[in-house]
Amino acid sequence: YLELVKYIFQSKYRKGFGVHSPSVFRLVTLVIEEDLPYYKFSLVEKVRSLTKNKLRGILRDNEDESLRQLTQSPIQKCLYTYDYEQLLFRLVNYYKPDAILEIGLATGFSTMYLAAPNSKATVTTISDSALLEEFSNSNFKSAGIENVEFAIGDIYSQFCTLMKTMS
């Protein structure tokens, strides 16, 4: 998926020129190349800025070294990047799905961007860390996002369970 986005940004079909399919043209021009901010972006970014120090404190005070090593790198990355998260927001806003499944949870900001466009859509996120779920849930509450459900435990078994209930 990431390579497709890189290709679109670097290809000669920039801004939709040369794309023959109307649906792909609309996707490129209205979603991928769109650079206008949505009102929800500022809400999520405000929560992000308020939680940077709080998150660092949780990682510093946590006794579990394996959790710290596992989450420190992705969390540091999530604190400062938002371009792909805003693309996720635009994709959800464009396609308007009823249910979204996210596998893996770092800080929950990408989950907020998935849940923000449509408060009626259910976003289910699978994570193996109750600590990150607790942290993310507090961020969701401060952002006013209530359409997120968590499945905590072994990611593979949680995924299998969710797929059985969805079908």
Predicted region positions:
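A short alpha-helical cap/connector motif
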Residues: Y1-S167
